């Protein structure tokens, strides 16, 4: 039997284990919140019973050598979406299969692939960039992020990743970010963060629903963090209270037209992450350490639920690195001497003036085709470290990663924009930064 046949049999058998329990769950969802709460306990028992059946089935007792061979072959052959959903299906079979996937399936930093939704909050690849595109809908004020599956930037050729919705307030603008294009409620477990601007649209703060690593105990006092996989979380829990980054646009006091100038302070990423041997803290070195196991905390045991978005995943936590610290309820966290480390600061790459075209130009390597004030490229800003050389002393050359474009964003058609990101940014962070470029800036242009 080929490994493709094994995977097909697993999906079919897995879907028939608890079809009755899945139907009960669907009925509960149709009846609304109050009725679904009544049936929640019954659904939980059905899911638990199905989990016990799967755990004791023949698939859970496959010889480790055979199981490893199946997963390794599948990981190598199903490298791109939509066929990569088979890897997700294997990780959803049982704990034994999930543990094997934990050993074999690596995060985007090392494999350059987005497999599980938790990958959206993990750093991008070190070698190369993950190519995405954003589709804007002005009528509904929504922005959808897709993974490019081909050279053509079309929704039909993209894998949906994230969605954002714009809300105008009296003194600010908010962009709420979700893992679903349909469920855009703040009380939903699809809600993962937001972007908030000031009145002028010159300063933005990126918020995440998950706290930095060293703030788990602080978040329980007054502000409670939510876990996406838990079905017992009240929808009235407070959301996104952790500031992880700040984006600022320089004011244009002279009123002359020109490119925007922006800076990003990534409180959750240390500047040392770009140095030789540097890493983003609280990220797994080679496997989906803890988040993958939490990703399947409330799986619906059916074939359709495995292949669709009813699989719920946890979010990876951010680092405890901060200068000024991430903010929780207006108070800085992690300000001890041990935790103080310079955050990564990104700045936009200065464009050059093209005399023949009479416009400012950047080399996007064919990924951007329409001139727009929204287009930008971000590189690491050079920061003087402690004990930096004096002006009379020659400064050492910056690390090679400081010259690389970490994030680029630009227009390709009406309401279509490309977004390419790499290490140390995650897809969530890159998407939030790009959303800031859409907002109206009264004093920057």
Swiss-Prot record:
Family designation: Belongs to the TUB family.
Coiled coil, from the record: none
PROSITE patterns named among the record's database cross-references: TUB_1, TUB_2
Lineage: Eukaryota, Viridiplantae, Streptophyta, Embryophyta, Tracheophyta
InterPro entries according to UniProt: F-box-like_dom_sf (IPR036047), F-box_dom (IPR001810), Tubby-like_C (IPR025659), Tubby_C (IPR000007), Tubby_C_CS (IPR018066)
Taxonomic source organism: Oryza sativa subsp. japonica (Rice)
Tissue-level expression: Ubiquitous.
Residue span, F-box domain: 56-114
CDD domains per UniProt: F-box_AtTLP-like
Protein name per the record: Tubby-like F-box protein 14
Pfam families, per database record: F-box-like, Tub
């Amino acid at each position: 039997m080929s490994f493709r046949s094994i995977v097909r049999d697993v999906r079919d058998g897995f879907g028939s284990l608890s079809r009755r329990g899945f139907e009960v769950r669907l009925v509960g969802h149709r009846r609304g919140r109050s009725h679904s709460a009544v049936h929640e306990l019954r659904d939980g028992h059905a899911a638990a019973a199905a989990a016990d059946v799967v755990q004791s089935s023949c698939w859970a007792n496959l010889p480790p050598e055979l199981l490893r061979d199946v997963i390794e072959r599948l990981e190598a052959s199903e490298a791109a979406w939509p066929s990569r959903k088979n890897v997700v299906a294997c990780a959803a079979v049982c704990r034994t299969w999930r543990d094997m996937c934990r050993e074999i399936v690596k995060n985007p930093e090392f494999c350059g692939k987005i497999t599980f939704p938790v990958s959206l909050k993990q750093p991008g690849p070190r070698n190369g960039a993950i190519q995405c595109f954003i589709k804007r809908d002005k009528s509904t004020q929504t922005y959808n992020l897709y993974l490019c599956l081909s050279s053509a930037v079309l929704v039909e050729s993209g894998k949906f990743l994230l969605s954002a919705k714009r809300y105008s307030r009296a003194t600010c603008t908010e962009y709420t970010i979700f893992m679903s294009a349909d469920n855009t409620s703040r009380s939903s477990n699809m809600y993962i963060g937001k972007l908030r601007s000031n009145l002028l649209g010159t300063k933005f703060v990126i918020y995440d629903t998950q706290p930095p690593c060293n703030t788990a105990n602080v978040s329980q006092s007054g502000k409670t963090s939510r876990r996406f996989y838990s079905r017992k979380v009240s929808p009235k829990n407070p959301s996104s209270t952790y500031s992880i980054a700040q984006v600022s646009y320089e004011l244009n006091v002279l009123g002359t037209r020109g490119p925007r100038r922006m800076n990003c302070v990534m409180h959750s990423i240390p500047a040392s992450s770009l140095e030789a041997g540097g890493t983003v803290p609280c990220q797994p070195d080679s496997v989906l350490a803890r988040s993958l196991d939490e990703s399947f905390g409330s799986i619906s045991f059916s074939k359709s639920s495995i292949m669709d978005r009813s699989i719920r995943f946890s979010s990876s936590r951010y680092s405890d690195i901060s200068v000024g610290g991430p903010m929780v309820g207006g108070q800085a966290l992690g300000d001890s001497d041990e935790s103080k480390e310079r955050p990564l600061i990104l700045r936009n790459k200065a464009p050059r003036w093209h005399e023949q075209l009479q416009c400012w130009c950047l080399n996007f390597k064919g990924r951007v085709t329409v001139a727009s004030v929204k287009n930008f490229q971000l590189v690491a800003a050079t920061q003087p470290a402690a004990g930096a050389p004096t002006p009379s002393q020659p400064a050492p050359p910056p690390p090679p990663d400081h010259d690389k474009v970490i994030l680029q964003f630009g227009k390709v058609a009406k309401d279509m924009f490309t977004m390419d990101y790499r290490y140390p940014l995650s897809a969530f962070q890159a998407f939030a930064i790009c959303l800031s470029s859409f907002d109206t800036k009264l004093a920057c242009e």
